[in-house]
From Swiss-Prot:
This is Glyoxylate reductase. It comes from the Archaea. Signal peptide: none annotated. PANTHER family: 2-HYDROXYACID DEHYDROGENASE-RELATED (PTHR10996), GLYOXYLATE_HYDROXYPYRUVATE REDUCTASE B (PTHR10996:SF283). Belongs to the D-isomer specific 2-hydroxyacid dehydrogenase family. GyaR subfamily. InterPro entries: D-isomer_2-hydroxyacid_DH, D-isomer_2_OHA_DH_cat_dom, D-isomer_DH_CS, D-isomer_DH_CS1, D-isomer_DH_NAD-bd, Glyoxylate_reductase_GyaR, NAD(P)-bd_dom_sf. It catalyses: glycolate + NAD(+) = glyoxylate + NADH + H(+). GO terms for molecular function: glyoxylate reductase (NADH) activity; glyoxylate reductase (NADPH) activity; hydroxypyruvate reductase [NAD(P)H] activity; NAD binding. It is found in: Cytoplasm. It comes from Thermococcus kodakarensis (strain ATCC BAA-918 / JCM 12380 / KOD1) (Pyrococcus kodakaraensis (strain KOD1)). One of its GO terms (cellular component) is cytosol. Homodimer.
């Protein structure tokens, strides 16, 4: 009898087809997030679970799933999963790093450039017919933004995505600063990056890109005190997690001019709506789509499948998060 895997949202077919060769596969068929009560019913007889970052996978889920041996998160982040509890129970947890690195780094630059050059404002001005109504072909003061080439970028979090952001910054002739829990000498040499304390990075940077995982240490690390350290002409880009930034402090900074603007792809709660924040013209907003390219999504689906197939074959999954779990239980169903 094949082990059973439940997938909480439809992922690209390439991953599903790979899984069907080894597993009995069930996919939640709806576009909306799976309701909690439905998830708890579905996991009762599954051996493996493929989850999205929107699902909370905790003791309640583990209690409802006595056969569960592995959770494959369709994301690079895994703060939606109680990894410590999973490890205690001998449940393997995997994620999807690397395959979405370039797409996410590209999107950080999309937000940075769109905010710096006021692209959304200009788009609305053109699309709404206001340009035509004004009857002026060109004006020297319309939508003045900020130069990017040759400026200083500060990257908070210098893992795969942070370093990919830095590689792109080299093409813009930028000075690259970074803050990380530990220094990265090889990356410094390759990218010409300079290590700074978080406070010094915020003071010196024209653009600050957040690319850290959400942990106890990074939660609300960008607060009012630190926002006040930034230049008044600086732009903040968050592609990390919403709770890395204190939203109330950020709104105050944007409204009172402590910083020039922000580009956000992530929020404290998702889905998210904040009329006060969303009414501000100096913020560019996206609904958590940093890795949303066809190539990245298909790569993530393939990696999910590879992790589950490896586990089924008694092998340690390629991107195992909780490596210490192998001491609790050997891979395999």
């Amino acid at each position: 009898m094949r082990p059973k895997v439940f997938i909480t949202r439809a992922i690209p077919e390439n991953g599903i087809e790979m899984l069907k060769e080894h597993f009995e596969v069930e996919v939640w068929p709806e576009e909306r997030e799976i309701p909690r009560e439905v998830l708890l019913k579905k996991v009762r007889d599954v051996d493996a679970l493929v989850t999205m970052l929107s699902e909370r996978i905790d003791s309640e889920v583990f209690d409802a799933a006595p056969r569960l041996r592995i959770v494959a998160n369709y994301a690079v982040g895994y703060d939606n999963i109680d990894v410590e509890e999973a490890t205690r129970r001998g449940i393997y947890v995997t994620n999807t790093p690397d395959v979405l690195t370039d797409a996410t780094a590209d999107f950080a630059w999309t937000l940075l450039l769109a905010t710096a050059r006021r692209l959304i404002e200009a788009d609305h001005f053109t699309r709404s017919g206001e340009w035509k109504r004004r009857g002026i072909a060109w004006h020297p003061r319309w939508f003045l933004g900020y130069d990017v080439y040759g400026k200083t970028i500060g990257i908070v979090g210098f893992g795969r995505i942070g370093q990919a952001v830095a590689r792109r910054a080299r093409g813009f002739g930028m000075r690259i600063l970074y803050y990380s829990r530990s220094r990265k000498p090889e990356a410094e040499k390759e990218l010409g990056a300079e290590f700074r304390s978080l406070e010094d990075l915020l003071r010196e940077s024209d653009f600050v890109v957040l690319a850290v995982p959400l942990t106890k240490e990074t939660q609300y690390m960008i607060n009012e005190e630190r926002l006040r350290l930034m230049k008044k002409t600086a732009i903040l880009v968050n592609i990390a997690r919403g709770k890395v930034v204190d939203t109330k402090a950020l709104m105050k900074a944007l409204k009172e001019g402590w910083i020039a603007g922000a580009g956000l792809d992530v929020y404290e709660e998702e889905p998210y709506y904040n009329e006060e924040l969303f009414s501000l013209k100096n913020v560019v907003l996206a609904p958590h789509i940093g890795s949303a390219t066809y190539g990245a999504r298909e790569g993530m689906a393939e990696l999910v499948a590879r992790n589950l197939i490896a586990f089924k074959n008694g092998e340690v999954p390629p991107t195992l998060v909780n490596k210490e779990v192998v001491k609790v239980r050997k891979p395999g169903f």
